[in-house]
């Protein structure tokens, strides 16, 4: 096969070169990082002043490069650099950068770094404000260091800094997620003593903690208290409590809570939405109580709330796992489509995928082919699952014929290059030369890129056939 063809098929990432612009940006980043890293190495006290004198433009790439250069014995300086960078008005750390800092500086494994830095601020009489301490607390949050976060919170007064609601929320969330709800509750009471009020984030953290601990009564009590501090009880909070109830297995109580949401319709604020109903439907389906799940779907429809794709997937899988017959599945799909929100294509595609995952291939293939006969376009996910299954069964010719039908329907497929390669290789191995050439031409038209290993195997398979016509077809642009 010509080298030019192999070059077109091989993934561009294996042969592309960085552009001049990318190289220039890289050099600029390295230059700034070198200057900042040099300040870190040469400074013995008040590092922040030295860093400010470098006068460089900071971005995430530069910060990452500086941290990456730090040796383990420089992690404390690296942490101070990261905190300083976050206090600048021209830069704000992303969640990704907090994660990177925790990973590079190994803060989870060496939590004492946090304490060393705070103590060094105090000894060197560095300027520390609320923003500085928030960044430290956010690092604790990212590293799941609840005890260290509480220690930092207690250090606020030493720098004449008053902790705000954001600072308390960061610590409360850590203890709530950890399951230490006594300390979290103590901190909420402490907020009241220092003139601060819990906000929606505070309550949400606590409610999540109570739900995770299975303390639904406490979660519900706290939700009712939200209004006392002008916090709106919304559908998100209700849904979280409802999810906790469903996980506990108390479905009767879940229905009671759902009824309360339906009754206390506050202009859409606490009215159940598709996510809320789907939580209850899924819980019933998991317990194989499909009839009750369908009753919840009826309630959903009666309130004018349309099911979404997730609702449809959950119900269809529930019906199939309950060994219901085809008539029951058809009835469900008709109801879902009539309610709106999901199409016939989405429902049939979901059924196909569910059946394949349940190892009920023959039924899945029948439904998939029925879709094509009825003129219903399957979605890309269903196509990918069907083609992959046919290739596993080595039914390459059947797979290719279906592939042709799908191409005619102009389906936006998620069929990846690996499936194309396996299908092409299988067609070659089984002597289906004409079909292989047609598939190869389609792949080239789509500018599809293959792994080197796949290209080599296909070339070898083509050689074994000895079909010169196929070789020439495969070489066509």
Curated annotation (Swiss-Prot):
Origin organism lineage:
Eukaryota, Viridiplantae, Streptophyta, Embryophyta, Tracheophyta
Which ranges does the UniProt record give for the PPR repeats? 129-163, 164-198, 199-233, 234-264, 273-307, 308-343, 344-378, 379-413, 416-450
- Taxonomic superkingdom: Eukaryota
Q: Does the keyword Repeat apply?
A: yes
Which PANTHER family does its entry note? PENTATRICOPEPTIDE REPEAT-CONTAINING PROTEIN GUN1, CHLOROPLASTIC, PPR_LONG DOMAIN-CONTAINING PROTEIN
Q: Has the keyword Signal been applied to this entry?
A: no
Pfam families recorded:
PPR, PPR_2
Keyword annotations from UniProtKB, A to Z: Repeat
Q: Which organism is it from?
A: Arabidopsis thaliana
Name of this protein:
Pentatricopeptide repeat-containing protein At5g47360
- Family that this chain belongs to: Belongs to the PPR family. P subfamily.
């Amino acid at each position: 096969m010509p080298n030019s063809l192999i070059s077109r098929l091989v993934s561009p990432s294996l042969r592309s070169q960085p552009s001049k612009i990318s190289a220039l940006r890289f050099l600029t980043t390295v230059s700034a990082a070198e200057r900042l890293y040099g300040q870190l190495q040469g400074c013995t006290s008040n590092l922040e002043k030295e860093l400010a004198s470098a006068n460089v433009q900071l971005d995430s790439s530069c910060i990452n490069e500086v941290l990456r250069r730090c040796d383990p014995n420089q992690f404390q300086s690296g942490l101070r650099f990261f905190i300083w960078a976050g206090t600048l008005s021209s830069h704000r750390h992303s969640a990704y950068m907090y994660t990177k800092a925790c990973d590079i500086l190994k803060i989870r494994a060496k939590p004492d770094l946090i304490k060393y830095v705070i103590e060094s601020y105090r000894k060197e009489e560095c300027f520390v404000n609320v923003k500085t301490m928030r960044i430290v607390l956010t690092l604790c949050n990212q590293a799941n260091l609840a005890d260290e976060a509480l220690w930092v919170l207690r250090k606020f007064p030493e720098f004449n800094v008053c902790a705000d609601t954001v600072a308390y929320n960061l610590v409360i969330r850590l203890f709530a997620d950890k399951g230490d709800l006594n300390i979290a509750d103590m901190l909420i009471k402490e907020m009241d003593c220092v003139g601060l009020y819990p906000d929606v984030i505070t309550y949400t953290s606590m409610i999540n903690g109570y739900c995770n601990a299975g303390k639904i009564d406490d979660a519900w009590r706290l939700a009712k208290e939200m209004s006392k501090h002008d916090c709106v009880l919304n559908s998100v909070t209700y849904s979280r409590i409802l999810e906790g109830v469903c996980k506990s297995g108390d479905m009767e109580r879940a229905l009671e809570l759902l009824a309360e949401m339906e009754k206390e319709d506050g202009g859409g604020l606490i009215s159940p939405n598709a996510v809320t109903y789907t939580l209850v439907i899924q819980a019933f389906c998991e317990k194989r109580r499909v009839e009750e799940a369908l009753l919840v779907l009826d309630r959903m429809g009666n309130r004018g709330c349309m099911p979404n794709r997730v609702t449809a997937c959950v119900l269809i899988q529930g019906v199939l796992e309950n060994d219901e017959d085809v008539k029951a599945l058809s009835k469900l799909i008709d109801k879902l489509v009539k309610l709106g929100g999901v199409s016939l294509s989405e429902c049939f595609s979901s059924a196909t995928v569910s059946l394949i995952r349940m190892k009920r291939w023959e039924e899945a293939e029948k439904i998939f082919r029925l879709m094509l006969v009825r003129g219903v376009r399957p979605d890309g996910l269903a196509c990918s699952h069907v083609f992959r299954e046919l290739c596993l069964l080595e039914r390459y010719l059947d797979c290719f014929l279906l592939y042709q039908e799908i191409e005619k329907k102009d389906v936006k497929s998620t069929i990846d290059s690996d499936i194309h390669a396996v299908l092409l290789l299988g067609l070659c191995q089984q002597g289906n030369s004409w079909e292989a050439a047609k598939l190869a031409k389609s792949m080239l038209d789509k500018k599809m890129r293959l792994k080197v290993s796949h290209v080599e195997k296909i070339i070898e398979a083509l050689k074994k056939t000895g079909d010169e016509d196929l070789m020439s077809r495969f070489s066509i642009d």
